[in-house]
Amino acid sequence: MCVLMEDSSMSNGIDVDKGFAIAFVVLVFVFLIVMVFRCVKLVKNPYEVSSTTADLPLN
């Protein structure tokens, strides 16, 4: 009977390692999606994206 109680408590408990792994995978996918959109924007119009860093005067 004690073994059954331990098994049920383990299934109802929060697995911290699994939570960290899922959170890490989700964050990596979000980062990759953001990078894909930024790269597509750069490929579509490279001059508009780089114009903010190249606005230095030529004096």
From Swiss-Prot:
Gene Ontology cellular component list: membrane
Pfam families: Cortexin
Main localization of the protein described in the UniProt heading: membrane
Domain of life: Eukaryota
Membrane topology: Single-pass membrane protein
Annotated compartments: Membrane
TM ranges: 20-40
Keyword Zinc-finger belongs to the record: no
Keywords, comma-separated and alphabetical: Membrane, Transmembrane, Transmembrane helix
InterPro entries: Cortexin
PANTHER family: CORTEXIN DOMAIN CONTAINING 2, CORTEXIN-1-RELATED
Protein name: Cortexin domain containing 2
Species in which this protein is naturally found: Mus musculus (Mouse)
Gene (UniProt): Ctxnd2
